[in-house]
């Protein structure tokens, strides 16, 4: 089929290509702007969140805030706000460890405090052990003797042996 206006068709195709490219760039800019705003917006607890839900953020070097006392059954939501990955785990008072998995930047993880929880729970990053938070659960119903019994017990000799192992491993030469 022969067209009567070949110059007009090629101009129309060029215009369509430019409009499509422009639309693609606008969509890409909007997508990047929404991602940037979401990752830097402050994380606030909304009024619709139940009272038994706590939110924390994980930055490059710390958990924040840690100014609440969770109760059994509470849910703790942790959002990775840093630009690096973390791998969070929780150590229970009896020494049990629960791995919450790897958190890439911008992701969120949830942990529910066990229904029978009492004592100190430690949140820590496998990759960056200096990043940790201690949460005292059910503090009102925790007697000091019950808390002390939850701590690991070591004999004097075990402590001395442990100290000796640490000191001797530091002094070893490769």
Curated annotation (Swiss-Prot):
InterPro entries noted in UniProt: Cupredoxin, MauL
Cite the SUPFAM superfamilies for this sequence: Cupredoxins
- Per the UniProt record, which residue ranges are transmembrane? none
Pathway in which this enzyme or protein is active: One-carbon metabolism; methylamine degradation
Q: Which residues form a coiled coil?
A: none
What exactly does this protein do? Probably involved in TTQ prosthetic group biosynthesis.
Q: What is this protein's record name?
A: Methylamine utilization protein MauL
Q: Which gene encodes it?
A: mauL
């Amino acid at each position: 089929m022969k067209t009567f206006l070949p110059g007009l068709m090629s101009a129309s195709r060029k215009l369509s290509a430019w409009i499509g490219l422009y639309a693609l760039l606008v969509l890409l800019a909007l997508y990047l702007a929404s991602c940037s705003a979401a990752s830097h917006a402050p994380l606030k607890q909304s009024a619709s969140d139940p009272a038994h839900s706590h939110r924390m953020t994980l930055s490059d070097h710390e958990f924040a805030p840690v100014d609440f006392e969770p109760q059994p059954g509470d849910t703790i939501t942790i959002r990775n706000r840093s630009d690096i990955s973390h791998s969070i785990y929780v150590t229970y008072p009896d020494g049990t460890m629960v791995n919450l998995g790897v958190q890439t930047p911008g992701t969120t993880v949830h942990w529910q405090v066990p229904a029978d929880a009492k004592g100190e729970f430690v949140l820590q990053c496998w990759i960056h052990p200096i990043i940790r938070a201690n949460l005292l659960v059910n503090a009102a119903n925790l007697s000091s003797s019950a808390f002390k019994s939850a701590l690991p017990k070591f004999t004097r000799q075990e402590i001395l042996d442990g100290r000796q192992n640490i000191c001797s491993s530091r002094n070893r030469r490769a």
